[in-house]
Structure formats: C-alpha cells, structure tokens
Amino acid sequence: MSSETPVYLHLPAVTYDGDIVFGNHVWGIYGSSDGDDVTTFTGTVSLRGLNGNYADMSGIQFKGNSGIGVNAYCLTLLSQCSFDGWDTAAIANNGAWVNAMDCTFTNNKIALKFNSSMAYGTAPNYLNNTFTGNGTAVCIENLPGNEVLDFAGSTFSENDVDIDNKAEHSVDTAKANFE
C-alpha cells in the first residue's frame, strides 16, 4: 500500500500486549469501550510517519509499568487517551510533534516530553488535560518554532515538577489549574 494512502483503524475494546510500530502513512487509530473494557495498549506504540504524514489517536488507554507509551516520529494528535505507569508516557522525537487534548496522564516518570529539533507539523494547544502524580508532567528538552504551548483548562496536580522547560519555549499556563 502506498505511503500516501491513509489508514483508519477502529479497534475493539481489547488489550493489545507488546510493542507495535505504525509505519509511514496517515493514521487514524480510534479506540472503543464495551462496559468496563477499553482499547488498551500495554507496550510501546511507535509512529513512524515521514514527509508530512501524521497520526490521530483517540479513545485509547496506554497502561505500562516502564518504557515509553507513545514514541512519535511524526505529528501525533492524541485525544481522550489515558497514560498510566510509563517512564515516558508520550515523546516527540526528532521530526515529530505530539499534541494532547482531553487526555489523562497519571503516575508516569515523565508524562509528555519534547526532544525534537524540527517538526513536519505543529499543534500547540494542550487543552483540558489532567496531569496527576507524575515525576515531571511536561518536559521540553528541545522544540522548534515559536508557537506558544497553551495549556488552557489543563490541571496539574501532585506532580514533582509541573513543567520542566529546558528549551525555554513559550508556554501559556494562565488558564491552567495548579493544585
């Protein structure tokens, strides 16, 4: 299948064990729920889109006990996802940008990490997320561009460090909640 062909996956409410790599496509990966069961990944999910390809993931639980939850090498849009128990819940590597909206990050060493010197796309609004009980909620080691990361409606609670901004990237927390 051509890398220009978008791939849309509507996943059942089951647990997927082990690591998985989604290759060079535009991805739409959508979880579901059935009673108490929710689409869940317990291994690292790597997203390898190139040259402007991206991934849109929604309604998925990422449950770990170490390692990386989402390992992004492309623009990755997360919505209504939850991350629990990772060394790093979601990371934007070189060429990538990770966006999260309406997501929950709980009990991770690092919840959201940026370590990218370039990106094929940006999405700077981090609206209505909940960061609770993480070592570091947001770690910005390296991030290109001059977009302001907006955390409006997001809640930071009981993290050791809420935002570690080594890159001194512009961040707006005026409408965020700190408990």
Where are these regions (language model features)?
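Acidic Gly/Asp/Thr-rich repetitive segments characteristic of extracellular carbohydrate-active
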Residues: 1-10
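A charged, solvent-exposed segment within the mature domains of Sec-exported extracytoplasmic proteins
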Residues: 81-86, 90-97, 102-105
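Glycine-rich beta-solenoid repeat tracts in large extracellular/virion proteins
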Residues: 19-22, 40-51, 68-75, 88-96, ...
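Right-handed parallel beta-helix/beta-spiral solenoid domain characteristic of secreted/periplasmic
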Residues: 17-19, 26-71, 79-83
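All-beta strand scaffolds that present successive hydrophobic residues in beta-strands
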Residues: 28-31, 54-59, 76-80, 97-101, ...
